[in-house]
A protein has these predicted regions:
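Conserved beta-strand scaffold positions in the cores of enzyme catalytic domains, especially
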Residues: 39, 238-240, 346-349
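Alpha-helical cap/lid subdomain in secreted, periplasmic
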Residues: 255-409, 428-441
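Bacterial N-terminal signal peptides
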Residues: 5-18
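Short, structured coil segments at secondary-structure junctions
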Residues: 126-127, 232-234, 306, 345
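Compositionally biased, intrinsically disordered or flexible polar/acidic segments
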Residues: 20-219
Length: 441
């Protein structure tokens, strides 16, 4: 992986872009210094100074280093006018993807939305369906810009070696590890006029956990980790290193913790939620109050050595109701063990086990099915994971964590006893679908 030189000033790409006729090479894309912006002007009209033109025929390749992912059915039009950036756009009536080759790191992405002649409605997701912008609406003739901070990662570990990826991480989950940023544009009429990307030294919130936390690649599965991004303003990146089927010990063996620690800076956060798969481990001395607690303490200690701030999260409940419509604990002693470690090590605790129980009971045995994937009592759909992410946000505020200053202030308070109506949920599904359950249960 090419290393990026640190610059302390913002550099313009106008000279490079103009010298190449508005086109950047893949090599230049992959060797950008901090604070140097990549600017893309979408549409066939006049290209704004310092921007690279993107046409509907601009298909991503390693050689080019940017473009629409294969299969994109987009229309790029020029409306005319003096404003080169806003006079043209690319749009579609179905989801499409745009990728840029980028080195590992945190990036601030700014997107210009709008159309001189029509209303636009756009939802933006990044990498493996991380929800970045829920719904951006513009009236005909109006434009708006929105920004977010996103993390791009690779398997390589700076001290040597790499994360031991599972087979699915090399196929359906490859966008999480492929040295490029992929953006999904979705909703009724997604339309974009410009994208600006700049590498930043923003703090990072790292996530480690299992299938209920990770970035699920395919519909109808989803996790709270990939919905959490929607509730943070620019200035902090969320790096989700959770993976389906993982326990604390298997994540350690796969070097996922090593990867996080190699990137962690003082003041970064590490949210840790395991249990679903740990409770299935067998062997002499294996259990909630032995190996599980010891592993939790190890994760906490290692994060603190790097100046990181660990936060423990109890495992989310499964959909297990009794005859009275109450949730039964399917995790045994594991939630209590997390609470013990939090108390013993003076670590902030997010009791998602308790909050999700309140949430499920508010829905009830039948209505709660609408928050899970079909025939699955463990893995959530988009709506269910969105509501769980709202639980996490409320716990961040209740714990008075420092990263609360990065939360979007317009988000209304949330009470899991009174969840959002499912019929009002409007995050569109991504186009990739599977009938295969994620590993773990």
């Amino acid at each position: 992986m090419k290393q990026i030189a640190l610059l302390v000033v913002v550099l313009s790409l106008s000279v490079v872009a103009e010298s190449l006729g508005g086109r950047l090479s893949a090599e230049e894309l992959s060797s950008l210094p901090y604070s140097q912006s990549l600017n893309f002007d979408f549409g066939p009209g006049k290209v704004a100074p310092g921007y690279t033109q993107v046409l509907q025929t601009t298909t991503y390749s390693k050689e080019l280093g940017y473009g629409f992912e294969p299969g994109a059915d987009v229309t790029c039009v020029d409306r005319g006018g003096r404003d080169a950036l806003r006079s043209d756009l690319c749009t579609s009536d179905q989801p499409f993807f745009f990728s840029v080759a980028l080195p590992e790191g945190n990036y601030e992405v700014t997107i210009t939305f709008g159309d001189q002649s029509a209303e636009t409605v756009t939802t933006v997701k990044a990498e493996l369906r991380r929800l970045m912008l829920e719904e951006v609406r513009t009236a005909a003739g109006k434009f708006t810009t929105r920004s977010f901070t996103v993390n791009v990662r690779t398997p390589q570990i700076s001290s040597g070696g790499e994360v031991k990826l599972k087979d699915r991480e090399k196929t359906s989950e490859l966008w999480a590890w492929d040295e490029k940023l992929t953006l999904e544009f979705n909703n009724e009429r997604p339309s974009i006029s410009a994208i600006e990307i700049v590498k930043v030294t923003a703090p990072t919130l790292f996530l480690l956990g299992d299938s209920t936390v990770c970035d699920q690649p395919l519909e109808p599965y989803n996790s709270w980790g990939q919905m959490l991004t929607r509730f943070f303003r620019p200035g902090i990146a969320i790096a989700n290193h959770a993976e389906s089927g993982e326990s604390l010990r298997s994540s350690l063996s796969a070097r996922r913790l090593d990867k996080v620690l190699s990137l962690m800076k003082p003041g970064d956060y590490l949210f840790i939620q395991y249990g679903h798969n740990d409770e299935k481990e067998k062997g002499e001395g294996v259990g909630a109050y032995t190996t599980y607690k010891a592993s939790l303490k190890h994760f906490v200690e290692e994060a603190r050595k790097c100046g990181g701030i660990p936060v423990l999260i109890t495992p989310v409940q499964r959909r297990t109701f009794d005859a009275q419509g109450k949730i039964t604990n399917s995790h045994g002693d594991y939630p209590a063990a997390v609470r013990q470690v939090a108390k013993e090590e003076n670590v902030p605790l997010i009791d998602l086990h308790a909050m999700s129980g309140v949430l499920y009971e508010a829905w009830g045995p039948e209505a709660s099915k609408r928050s899970f994937a079909p025939n699955d009592g463990t893995h959530h759909n988009n709506y269910g994971s969105y509501e769980l992410a709202r639980c996490i946000i409320e716990a961040i505020k209740a714990n008075k964590l420092g990263l609360a200053k990065y939360l979007i202030t317009s988000t209304a308070p949330f009470d899991p006893a009174h969840p959002d109506p499912v019929d009002s949920f409007n995050v569109p599904a991504s186009p990739q679908v599977t009938a295969v359950k994620p590993p773990g249960s």
